[in-house]
């Protein structure tokens, strides 16, 4: 899972949760 090793993906996921 490259997403776990990608800080950008993690940041994007956090923004997605905050945008909810």
Swiss-Prot record:
GO terms for cellular component: cytoplasm. Coiled coil: none annotated. Its main location: cytoplasm. It is found in: Cytoplasm. The keyword Amino-acid biosynthesis does not apply. It comes from the Bacteria. Disulfide bonds: none annotated. Keywords: Cytoplasm. Modulates RecA activity. Belongs to the RecX family. This is Regulatory protein RecX. It comes from Azotobacter vinelandii.
